[in-house]
UniProtKB/Swiss-Prot annotation:
Gene Ontology annotations for the cellular component aspect, listed alphabetically: cytosol
The keyword Heme is assigned to this record: no
Pfam families for the chain: NusB
Superkingdom of source: Bacteria
Organism for this UniProt entry: Vibrio campbellii (strain ATCC BAA-1116)
Function: Involved in transcription antitermination. Required for transcription of ribosomal RNA (rRNA) genes. Binds specifically to the boxA antiterminator sequence of the ribosomal RNA (rrn) operons.
Keywords: RNA-binding, Transcription, Transcription antitermination, Transcription regulation
Protein name: Transcription antitermination protein NusB
């Protein structure tokens, strides 16, 4: 991570990427279309936007990281799913869509962004699960990532 990128900007990038990945999973729209909707502020989100929600613009959000996460997860979702599958106790198609988006995002960071410590990846996924997923999803996400980390990261 460059010295100029703040952890909060990365956290915001993950938050927007998670929402965009979730949107892609539901709609299967073109990634560029979804990215543009998020960058323009015209999200699919049916819920009211919170006043405290960060802006998808620098310096508040690492926009380049958002783009990398979104396109990286979408382009490699099948490979990511094959890395996740051994660590989930139920069929992938039975996973909640938000849990799947979280696991794909975290697995992408674990396997493609060795500069991000795996403990940071897991912690960020847990925090996102607490905000965006079902009540106990953070426990499930934590369990899957804890089991997967030693096998996908050689550290």
């Amino acid at each position: 991570m460059g010295a100029s990128v703040k952890p909060a900007a990365r956290r915001n990038a993950r938050q927007f990427a998670l929402q965009a990945i979730y949107s892609w999973q539901i709609t299967k729209d073109n990634v560029a279309t979804i990215e543009e909707q998020f960058l323009s502020g015209d999200k699919y989100d049916e819920e009211e936007l919170h006043a405290s929600e960060p802006a998808l613009a620098a310096p508040e959000t690492d926009v380049a990281y958002f783009r990398e996460l979104l396109s990286g997860v979408v382009l490699s979702h099948s490979e990511l799913d094959s890395k996740i599958r051994p660590y989930v106790s139920r069929p992938m198609q039975d996973l909640d869509m938000m849990e799947l988006a979280l696991l794909r995002l975290a697995m992408y960071e674990m396997t493609r962004r060795e500069d991000v410590p795996y403990k940071v990846v897991i912690n960020e996924a847990i925090e996102l699960a607490k905000v965006f997923a079902a009540e106990d999803s953070h426990k499930f996400v934590n369990g899957v990532l804890d089991k997967a980390a030693p096998h996908v990261r050689k550290k």
